[in-house]
Every structure is written in C-alpha cells, then in structure tokens.
Amino acid sequence: MKLYDNTTENGQNYRNPVLYMDYSDPDVIRVGEDYYMVASSFTYLPGVPLLHSRDLIHWEQLAWCVKKLPFARYDLPAHGCGTWAPAIRYHDGMFYVFIPLPDEGIFVTTAKNPAGPWSELHCIKQACGWIDPCPFWDDDGNAYMAHAYAKSRCGIKHRI
C-alpha cells in the first residue's frame, strides 16, 4: 500500500501530501487567481493560520488571524478547547474568518488584506456547542450562517 502518490498536474510533478503539517479542519476559498486556506489551531497562539497558494500545490503562510483569545482561561493550556474549524470568506472587498470557540460561540475577524492586519475577535453569536460555521451572503445582500452542533460541549460526552 502506497501512502504517498506522485502526481502530475499540467506537466508539473508533485507528491502528496502537499502540506507536511497538521492543518486540521481546513477551509479554502478562491479570490481571483489566488487560493486562501485557514485551519484550526485550538489553544495554540498566535492562532488560525492563513495560507496562500496560486496552484493548490505550493503554499505559504501569510498570517495568523488570531493574536489572543478573548478569555483568560486560554492563558493556560486547555486540551480540546480553542479555535475549531474556522471558515474563510471574501465579500465586498473584505476577508472574513469565522472562528468557533465551541464553549463560547462564533467569532469573526476581518481584514482588507489577507496578510493582515486582522481585527480583534468580535462575537457574532454567544452559544455553547456551535461549531463548523458555513457563512454565506445571498444575492439580496443578507448574510446567513449554517453550523454544526457539538452536544459534547454541553456536558454530554458519551452515552452508553
């Protein structure tokens, strides 16, 4: 069984995986000819890495979207907490990164340039268990967000 495949794309060879890092829960958008990716960083700070690529093969990190989490409890290690599965969007000349903190709610940070600077986190919905945001803007300009729910964040870990 091969773990890594050599692949050819437009005459260019590359080897999977193309990123030798743990970028959990990635979300990727395309703006023009550029691709941008964000990923979970949990309680590691700075947090929420933002990467850039023009070909989905070669990536470089541009920024960290979060300098500090807005709760004192994150000043200490907290396994399983912090930023989970962020979502990156581009709308009306602005980059948005929606960041769930599953014990606190959904937060957003914005920047005109993906390299930053990124705004301080702003809570858009205080909630327990909200994860995996999927925001979008409708044709009428209204913004909406679908999300998942982690029941384990509300005191139920397992049922036997």
What role is predicted for each listed range?
Residues 1-160:
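Carbohydrate-active catalytic/glycan-binding domains of CAZyme proteins
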